[in-house]
Amino acid sequence: MWIGIISLFPEMFRAITDYGVTGRAVKNGLLSIQSWSPRDFTHDRHRTVDDRPYGGGPGMLMMVQPLRDAIHAAKAAAGEGAKVIYLSPQGRKLDQAGVSELATNQKLILVCGRYEGIDERVIQTEIDEEWSIGDYVLSGGELPAMTLIDSVSRFIPGVLGHEASATEDSFAEGLLDCPHYTRPEVLEGMEVPPVLLSGNHAEIRRWRLKQSLGRTWLRRPELLENLALTEEQARLLAEFKTEHAQQQHKHDGMA
């Protein structure tokens, strides 16, 4: 996968290119990242990249000409088929379904805004899609872009050590992940659930699915509203609710 970055601070993306899973993907040639700074397309000695908004108000906007020229340079490098994305609070909220959808693209160009944003006409003429990582304000689009790159790159074949990892992640099936345990078997009196030590793969799968359903019900119940549960999932969720109620009753009795 090829990803182009439009940013005033391209150095920030070393967090993606030099470290962790994405760093290995870049090193192994599975992910290619190039960046363009609008500052490199300015024509004044101050390398100005901001301008006042019409109508007044606080803050500045990114200057149109350097930004457009940077986008055009990225498009030229990408060739045909690159989707241009602007990271914006007004965009579609990124979720696992959206990540999976974006991962089907071989080429992406991510435009990172700064200041109060970018000219609406640039959005209309240069941007294919707007995406947001949440309903809150950040200083720029770099962190959302890195979030998008990290999540999308997990779907690139060969990036993860285990090919099933991406499909078993939290939200991969619309559910939160189940609890995980490693050594020691007993930690300050807290034991690993016996089923995970049993070697019975069918029971382990069943336990993990039940815990995943239960954790989603407890922490993000709205996610279940959009799911059509199978008979097995509905049965396991009912079991979890019963067990949870019993544990709560026992806990209340001891309090």
From Swiss-Prot:
GO terms for biological process: tRNA methylation; tRNA N1-guanine methylation. It is found in: Cytoplasm. InterPro entries: Alpha/beta_knot_MTases (IPR029028), tRNA_m1G_MeTrfase_C_sf (IPR023148), tRNA_m1G_MeTrfase_TrmD (IPR002649), tRNA_m1G_MTases_N (IPR029026), tRNA_MeTrfase_TRMD/TRM10 (IPR016009). It catalyses: guanosine(37) in tRNA + S-adenosyl-L-methionine = N(1)-methylguanosine(37) in tRNA + S-adenosyl-L-homocysteine + H(+). Changing P184A: Loss of activity; no effect on tRNA binding. Keywords: Cytoplasm, Methyltransferase, S-adenosyl-L-methionine, Transferase, tRNA processing. Changing P193A: Loss of activity; no effect on tRNA binding. Changing L197A: Loss of activity; no effect on tRNA binding. One of its GO terms (molecular function) is identical protein binding. Its EC number is 2.1.1.228. Belongs to the RNA methyltransferase TrmD family. The specific activity of this enzyme increases only slightly with increased growth rate. This enzyme is present at ca. 80 molecules/genome. Specifically methylates guanosine-37 in various tRNAs. This is tRNA (guanine-N(1)-)-methyltransferase. The lineage of its organism: Bacteria, Pseudomonadati, Pseudomonadota, Gammaproteobacteria, Enterobacterales.
